Amino acid sequence: MPRDLRLSPLKHTWVLDFDGTLVKHNGYKTGNDEWLPGAVEFLRSIPQGDLVILLTAREEAARERTLEFIRDAGVRIDHVFFEVPMGERILINDTKPSGLVCAHAVCPSRNQGLENLKIVVDENL
């Protein structure tokens, strides 16, 4: 189901899981990393100036191969954290006095990809 992620024109911080969200889950274990549908396009649609952070449970030994895979796709990533715990990711942030909600959670099914998620910058927020 298509979904618009409606955001303010302020700069944003993106925290994205890697395996199962952007690339096929556990593909790196067989040497076959594969971008999921819409993942590269979604990453390229993130506004310039925003901070992009990837989280992965991959072991440190997979760092260079993973970073090379990301570079080869020509997407901009600012930081990648390896050996992140596999449990839930919790983000806690306030709501601005104007009512602007400063945290969003998007939880696609594993290996679904992001082709149905669109970033919309709303100048009225």
What is each model feature region?
Residues M1-L125:
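HAD-like aspartate-dependent phosphatase fold
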